[in-house]
């Protein structure tokens, strides 16, 4: 890789989008621990943002309460910015969305 390309990549902000998948044989509690571990590793590697997406009624996905999971991850990281990578707007009153994510 050329020096110019290398310097451009080093200035690129990287993010993670986590759906909090429950691996086969695992539990939601395992997933939450793994999500925190992934966020901490992303932070150590210099990623700038960690996004969590909301999903409901999907077997194998544990991110139904996005705002709670965001707080859980943010409370166990130091610098990485943690936020919502997707909210199902019809499922929530507008004021709740504004208060939690505004």
PLM ranges: what are they?
Residues 29-34, 90-102:
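Glycine-rich anion/phosphate-binding loops
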Residues 1-82:
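N-terminal beta1-alpha1-beta2 module of alpha/beta enzyme domains
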